[in-house]
Each structure stands twice: as C-alpha cells, then as structure tokens.
Amino acid sequence: MTNRLIATKTHVLNQLCGFLREREMLPAIAFVFSRKQVELYASSITVPVLEFDSKVAYTVKYECEQIIRKLPNYLEYLQLPEYIKLVELLEKGIGIHHSGMIPILREIVELMISKKYIKILFATESFAIGLDCPIKTAIFTSLTKFDGHNERYLMSHEYTQMAGRAGRRGIDTIGHVVHCNNLFKPLSSLDYKTILNGIPQKLVSKFRISYSLMLNLLKNGQTTDFHLFIEKSMVHNEIQNAIKGLIHEKTELTEEISKKMKFIEVAETPRTICDELLSLNEIIPNCVNKRRKKAEKDKQLLVYNYKNIINDAARVNELNNLKIKCQEIDNVTKNTISYIKSQTDTICDILLNSNIIKPLDDTTQSNSFELTTTGKFASNISELHPLIISRLVNEKWNNFADFSTKQMIGLFSCFTTIKVSDEYKLTIENIDDSYLCYRIKEIENMCIEYNDIEYNNSLDTGIDYDNMIQYDIVELSMKWCDCSNEMECKQFIQTDVSDMSISVGDFTKSMLKIVTIANEFINIYEQSENTDTLYKLSLIERMILKYIMTSQSLYV
C-alpha cells in the first residue's frame, strides 16, 4: 500500500506564487469562478510576492486613504471591515476583484493595478473584459464554471479571452498561462482540446422583437410597417442565412427523392402493392381479434406473392418520409420568410388588446396605429415590463395613490436582479405588508397572462417571466428605509444583509436599481400634474441612497 500525498489548495497556491516570483513571472491574475473562493484564495497566500525593496507595504494604506478622502462620506468607508481587509491584502501585494464588491473598493483595486502595486490578483472572469492591466501570467484555478443552470467546461472563446490577459503588448515578448490541474478534477484529452482550441463563438444577434421596441417606434413617429425597420437589423441577416440553409437542404432532399423514384420505378413490386403493405403495417398494431387476423393474413399473402416486397416497400417508405420532410422544410421556409412580419403583427394585436395602441383612423381598417394614454405611459418604461406596469398603474392602482413611499420601494425591489442562494430564497408569503402583497400578486397574474399569450403565439420577446419577480429583498429594502443614522446603517448591513449572505456590493446595486426605476417614473409624472405621486417618488432616492449605498465613483 502506497501513501498518496494530497496537496491542499492553500499549499498549491503558495507554492505557485513563490515559483512565479522567483522566475519574475509576476504580476499575475488568478481566475476564480466563485466570489467566495476569490476572497478565500487571496487570504490564503502567505508567501511574499512583493519585491524585496518594495515600499508598497508601507505606502499603500496611506494612498488608499488619500483616494477615499475624495468622497464626502469617506469616514464611513474607512471603518468598513471590507475596506480594512482589502488594505491588508494590498499591503501584501494581493488584490481581489469581483462584481459583489462595493463599487468604490473595486475601483481602488483597479487604480492599484494600474500603479503596479498588485502582484497577484484573484478575480472572476468579469475582469477579463474591458479593463487594461499589466499582467505577465494568467492562472486558471479551474476550467469549469457554473452558468446559472449547470456546471460546465469553459467555452473556447471564454478561455481565450482570459488567457489573452497574459503578456503586455509592446512590453512582454511572451505571456504565461498556468493551469492548476492539481486543484480540479482531471479532464479528458478531448475536453482539453475543445477548451484550448474549440470552434470560435458564432456572432449571433440577441436582437428581439419586443414590446419596448415597438413602443419606441411608435413614440418616435412611426405608425405602420414596423417590420421594415426591423429588417435593417442583424437578425434579418440571420433569417436570410437560415432561409438559404433551408433551400440548400431542400435541394439535397429533392435530388435524393429523384434517385429513390428511379429505383422504385424499376422495382419488381408495383408501387400500389408496396403502399398496400405499408398501410397494413400501420393498422395491424391497432386492430384486434378478427380484423387483426384478416390484416395479418393479407400481409402474409402479399409477402408470399411478391418475393422482394419487403425491400421494395422499405424504399417506398423512405421515399414517403423524404417527401414529408420536404414538406416540413417548405412550411418552415414559409414561416421563416414571414417571421419578422408575423411577429410585429402579433405584437401589434397584443398592444391593441391591451389598450396600449389604437388605430389612427377609426373609420377604416387601417394598419396605422398611435399610442393611447396608457401606451404613452408604457413607452417611457424600460426597466420594467412596459405593458404590465402601465396597465396596472393606470387602470388599477390609480397612479400609486394608495402606495406609501416605502411600499413603492418594496414593490420596485421585486425587479432587482440580486442573486440569493437557495437556502435564503424567499416567497411572497414572507412579505408582511398585506397591501403590497396583494399588488404583487396582481403583477404575478399578469405575468402568467402575458407568458401564455407569448407561448400560444410563438413570440420571443426576450422576457423571462419565470424569473421576472423575486421577493428576496422586499422586506430588507423597506427595513433599510428606517435606518436613520450611521450606526443603524452599519448594524443593518452587518446583521440583516449579512444573514442572507448578500454582499454589500450586490445590495448597493439593488438599491441603485430601485432608484433608476423611481427616476423613470419621476420623468413620466413630471409631464403630468400628479404632484402627490411625484412627491412620493422623489423621496425614494434620499431614503435608500445613504451611508455607503451611493452611486459615487472615484473616476468622476
């Protein structure tokens, strides 16, 4: 029996950092596909990564403080545990970067990278896009990632984007890429080859014929022929390519049908006899008693009289299947050619039935439309489902007349995209406010209604109705409004927010999203005389953007 030594992640990473430092392969970026692991890996580094004569360890704390002092509420940031922990890492030449960080702290890391103070950066893949930094080595702590549904291997273009960070243009002649194979399960040679040298990502349009698109066209003066505008988009080119592919496929099928026909014409068994056998094969499984016995007897008689009938009938069956497939391609081609027109017409019908648009001329069956009052309201909404919200606000909620500002905040929080682990997921039953709960259920019902409409009409508007509403921070956001001083805010973040495993950065983004939604409604109500609703909406920003929950930036 042999002893097998299993290296811990901490040991592997420390050995690697020492190796890179000795061979002057720093600065490096280590890609980690988990926010929690980013901070754990960074904290586990104990070997020195800074140069022997580096002054970073003594000066970085002062420089960070000087940067933070640009903010009016800098003292609140200086006392944050997240800030203190980050500075401790920076003093060792280590940085972290992920989307769950407080935006200001993330910007500090980016500034420190540009100053070359960070020798090893632990980051998620979001850092691979859009940020310039001096990196010699790219480290992969894993070659798999969770894509929101399943754990999967990196795609070739994702790997290339991250690995391409190694080596600075015009400075380095070579970039190093390190795979920590002893930190993850071994891959097959085929999987490795696919990741390193797979098929490049195809450029696919994410353009959708949506309600917002149609509303914007109407808002900007277009009243008819909406499909003509959409045909200028990239999706039109994709449709044309799909049509070419279908035509090519039909041509190949037609040639194959022609070849089959020639064989059948010279076959020993007449075509009508083959069809009779195929018909018997279809009805025998569904027949019983006397009818089944008669059908089987007829089949045996045909097989006895025509020696090659089995093979000849098989060819006829193949021919029939090819003709069916050819007809299916014709139908798909027809639908594809008229896709844009049929989609825009269907959306127009939905907008008409939802009282969002009306015909320009009531006396004729015109295909020209204009926005109704509810439609004008909907055309100014982009953060939420324009049809559902405009109909509810105008037809049922009397322009938020019975909502308090806190209830509005709770309502808007349903449309934030915060991610909470399954063990902390909440449902509508967790909402204490009965009035707000009732209103949210109205939104749910309309989501079901429009989801069914789109499904029945084969529409693809790009709206994910299953995940459109979430209830995880409804109570949190309303409770946040009650925090009136720094101590209460700090305690709320360290208890209520932390207890749900929500990062301060994610909670900040959610509060900013609520403010964005509120500002959208403010722009709408500024054009009307509804001062009561406008006043309630104007209170939202000051109620939730406080303490470190702000839109401040060090780059401005």
Can you name each region flagged by the protein language model?
Residues L90-E91, G95, G100-P103, E107, ...:
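Non-catalytic terminal extensions of ATP-dependent helicases
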Residues C133, T137-Y192:
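Conserved segment of the helicase C-terminal RecA-like domain
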Residues L20-E24, L86-E88, M112-K115, L131-D132, ...:
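Conserved catalytic network of the ASCE P-loop NTPase/AAA+ motor domain
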Residues M1, T8, L13-C17, F31, ...:
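Conserved C-terminal RecA-like helicase domain
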